[in-house]
């Protein structure tokens, strides 16, 4: 990864920190990347850069105005070329605050352990919505306005922030994708999905399947009861219910 020298404008586009230990040979935090191994990689001059996923995907420094402006240019490029909108992967992971002493106290990838007040150092910070408000202004320059949906694994009381009209406008509701073909489980997912959109004014989203879960046709056909007719009923009912409801359904096509 070529980023010039410490303190350079090029390096400031990313998140670099000095390491721990007498020689700085230990990562700045104890975090693991999403795909395993340390979330930090050391460069020859001794500093470490943050990558919440693979080392080939260094995290951007969203406090850098140049980074933000470049993304606005990219959004314009694709919308000018006919894109209808964007699925924003890991939408909760842009803004970060690493200038604190308690970083090792936080679990990075466990949603249930995340605070619900926007104070986690790297996940679902309040500042991320400043970024999306800028994006929304770009989306609204087009007629009709560009569509966007957040893939954001955040606490339920934080979901509406991503779905608000001045933000991305939609957020994936993954509860549907996590439920089995069981009456009470499906009922809970539907009721919670409808309730969650009342605060944002958005429409409900039903994620039936994506690349992280078993396809819905297979999942609803799993042998929870021993009759093939019941399995087919589950598949047909889910599609009819979801596709005819006041919502935006999402499914895996590839």
Which residues fall in each region the model found?
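Active-site and adjacent substrate-binding regions of carbohydrate-active enzymes
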Residues: 1-254
